[in-house]
Amino acid sequence: MMELIPQPRTKFLRVQCPECNNEQIVFGSPATVVKCLTCGKVLVEPRGGKGKVKAKILEILG
């Protein structure tokens, strides 16, 4: 059966920085590099679609 209302394929992720253990919510398909707000380490890099996550994923949010 066809979906009447399509759901988005993109998600938000709750990730934990490997350096300082700061938890941060990031977009799974970013257009720019996402850095940790505390220490500045790169958490997610854009890859032309879904981003390359370089941090531990704690939770996938809606």
Swiss-Prot record:
It comes from the Archaea. Pfam families: Ribosomal_S27e (PF01667). Zn(2+) binds at residues 17, 20, 36, 39. Keywords: Metal-binding, Ribonucleoprotein, Ribosomal protein, Zinc, Zinc-finger. A zinc finger (C4-type) spans 17-39. GO terms for biological process: ribosomal small subunit assembly; translation. Coiled coil: none annotated. Binds 1 zinc ion per subunit. InterPro entries: Ribosomal_eS27, Ribosomal_eS27_Zn-bd_dom_sf, Ribosomal_zn-bd. GO terms for molecular function: RNA binding; structural constituent of ribosome; zinc ion binding. HAMAP family: Ribosomal_eS27. Part of the 30S ribosomal subunit. Belongs to the eukaryotic ribosomal protein eS27 family. This is Small ribosomal subunit protein eS27. The gene is rps27e.
